[in-house]
């Protein structure tokens, strides 16, 4: 594992991606903890943390410019609270192939009102009962979930499912959280096989499409 230091950040690739966003490439260093990002001087629109060992999405300083975070193929099982305070413009959070377990663990994203794109593909959470409708209900700001546009009929179905006392009871039953996090606990001894290079490229293309889609909506 490699500690995310200011020196590493300075050495990593930095470039303008196809949608003209400034991107920092931190892929493949087996970084366990997000830290020291103040060293970026808030100069990036996108940070790519793919292929590391991050277990919790937190540790961000105030980064007013950052809009897109890619965390494909890590070990993420927790999302920190109050992300909106440190990432006031966060639009995209890609968590494909991680270890998110319980629907209630997504509740910390409720306050991130700027979030429009979320991917939880290849996470245990996606096999939970009513997964997609629960996320649509809890995170109405999300327009693209697992690279599929949230349709109006899905919003209506989610509203109906969680309406009234029965709906509230169902949401409470579904929305339990994982037990208190202990580093290394309840994690597989072998990391599941991650996306292939082709998969990663596809995710990149999809993310670029999301950015274009978001910008188009913003300009309407």
PLM regions and their residue ranges:
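Active-site glycine-rich loop that binds ribose-phosphate moieties when present
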Residues: 102
């Amino acid at each position: 594992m490699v500690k995310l230091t200011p020196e590493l950040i300075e050495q990593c690739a930095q470039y303008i991606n196809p949608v003209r966003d400034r991107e920092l490439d931190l892929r493949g260093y087996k970084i366990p903890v997000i830290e020291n990002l103040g060293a970026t001087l808030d100069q990036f629109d996108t940070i790519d943390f793919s292929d590391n060992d991050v277990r919790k999405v937190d540790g961000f300083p105030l980064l007013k410019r950052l809009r897109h975070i890619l965390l494909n193929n890590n070990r993420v099982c927790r999302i920190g609270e109050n992300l909106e305070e440190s990432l006031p413009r966060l639009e995209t959070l890609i968590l494909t192939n991680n270890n998110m377990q319980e629907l209630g663990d997504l509740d910390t994203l409720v306050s991130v009102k700027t979030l429009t794109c979320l991917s939880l593909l290849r996470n245990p959470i996606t096999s939970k009962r009513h997964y997609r409708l629960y996320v649509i209900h809890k995170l109405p700001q999300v327009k693209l979930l697992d690279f599929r546009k949230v349709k109006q009929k899905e919003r209506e179905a989610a509203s109906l499912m969680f309406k009234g006392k029965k709906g509230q009871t169902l949401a409470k039953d579904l929305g339990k959280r994982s037990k208190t996090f202990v580093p290394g606990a309840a994690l597989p001894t072998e990391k599941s096989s991650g996306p292939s290079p082709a998969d990663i490229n596809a995710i990149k293309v999809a993310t670029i499409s999301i950015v274009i889609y978001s910008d188009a909506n913003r300009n309407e």
